[in-house]
């Protein structure tokens, strides 16, 4: 039985999950829900199913794997990662994984906040000014390691890749001063399964956000 991943028909919070499912060669199917156009942004496609799936906290994304039904994007990532020993092995690695998972969410939410704001154009210059400092912290945390937890790939590499790529789309030169992050991105995109997925018709590079967003909605 394939796992079922449910999410909007956008990149959003499912990007790292899709990448991890592909990397681990997991048998899965997607249920993608669409949102209507302005001004109503009709969500009935999802709302009609929302409370019929047996989810404890009905939301998107969700993952159904037999009797296991999960929501919350990071819980889903961890569930898949545990099956493939991608959560870090030593205490040091697991600490790095835990810190980074939460740091990435903070950075992602800060970006989403301005991209969904009607004051986007007013907020954009201030946001652009903050990007180098945010990116620098990731660069220093990675250091000379190949992956963010250490020598081995973990699920947080999928999260960091996603958030760095989003910032790269927003400001194409934002990684230029950080060669170790550019190398990390090349290393990640060069993984055999990831590279094959990115060339496939299943790959969904965008839109980054929903139609309600001011930026990243196409």
From Swiss-Prot:
Q: EC?
A: 2.5.1.18
Q: Give yes or no: UniProt keyword Metal-binding.
A: no
In this chain the GST C-terminal domain maps to 90-208
| Keywords for this protein | Cytoplasm, Lipid metabolism, Transferase
Q: Which residues bind substrate?
A: 116
Query: What InterPro entries does the database record attribute to this sequence?
Result: Glutathione-S-Trfase_C-like (IPR010987), Glutathione-S-Trfase_C_sf (IPR036282), Glutathione_S-Trfase_N (IPR004045), GST_C (IPR004046), GST_mu (IPR003081), GST_superfamily (IPR050213), Thioredoxin-like_sf (IPR036249)
Give a short account of what the protein does: Conjugation of reduced glutathione to a wide number of exogenous and endogenous hydrophobic electrophiles. Protects against the thiol-mediated metal-catalyzed oxidative inactivation of enzymes. Involved in the formation of glutathione conjugates of both prostaglandin A2 (PGA2) and prostaglandin J2 (PGJ2). Participates in the formation of novel hepoxilin regioisomers.
Report what the protein is called: Glutathione S-transferase Mu 1
Which molecular function terms from Gene Ontology are attached? glutathione transferase activity
Q: Which GO terms describe its biological process?
A: glutathione derivative biosynthetic process; glutathione metabolic process; hepoxilin biosynthetic process; prostaglandin metabolic process
Q: Report any Pfam family annotated for this entry.
A: GST_N
Instruction: Return the SUPFAM superfamilies for the record.
Output: GST C-terminal domain-like, Thioredoxin-like
Q: PROSITE patterns annotated for this entry?
A: GST_CTER, GST_NTER
* Location of the protein in the cell: Cytoplasm
Annotated source species: Bos taurus
Per the record, its GO cellular-component terms are: cytoplasm
Per the database record, which ranges form the GST N-terminal domain? Answer: 2-88
Q: Which reaction does it catalyse?
A: RX + glutathione = an S-substituted glutathione + a halide anion + H(+); prostaglandin A2 + glutathione = prostaglandin A2-S-(R)-glutathione; prostaglandin J2 + glutathione = prostaglandin J2-S-(R)-glutathione; prostaglandin J2 + glutathione = prostaglandin J2-S-(S)-glutathione
Q: Which residues bind glutathione?
A: 7-8, 43-46, 50, 59-60, 72-73
Residue ranges of coiled coil: none
Q: What family does this chain come from, according to its entry?
A: Belongs to the GST superfamily. Mu family.
- Cross-referenced CDD domains: GST_C_Mu (cd03209), GST_N_Mu (cd03075)
Q: How does it assemble?
A: Homodimer.
């Amino acid at each position: 039985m394939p796992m079922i991943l449910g999410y909007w028909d956008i990149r959003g919070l499912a990007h790292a999950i899709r990448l991890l499912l592909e990397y681990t060669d997991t048998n899965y199917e997607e249920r993608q829900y669409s949102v209507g156009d302005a001004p109503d942004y009709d969500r009935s496609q999802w709302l009609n199913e929302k409370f019929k799936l047996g989810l404890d906290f009905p939301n998107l994304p969700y993952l159904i794997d037999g009797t296991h039904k999960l929501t919350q994007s990071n819980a889903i990532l961890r569930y898949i990662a545990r099956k493939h020993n991608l959560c870090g092995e030593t205490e040091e690695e697991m600490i790095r994984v835990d810190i980074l998972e939460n740091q990435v969410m903070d950075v992602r939410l800060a970006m989403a906040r301005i991209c969904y704001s009607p004051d986007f154009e007013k907020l954009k210059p201030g946001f652009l000014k903050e990007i180098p400092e945010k990116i620098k912290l990731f660069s220093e945390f990675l250091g000379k390691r190949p992956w963010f937890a250490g020598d081995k790939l973990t699920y947080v590499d999928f999260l960091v890749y996603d958030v760095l790529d989003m910032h790269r789309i927003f400001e194409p030169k934002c990684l230029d001063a950080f060669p170790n992050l550019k190398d990390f991105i090349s290393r990640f995109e060069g993984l055999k399964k990831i590279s094959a997925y990115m060339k496939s018709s299943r790959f969904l590079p965008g839109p980054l956000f929903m139609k309600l967003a001011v930026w990243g909605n196409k």
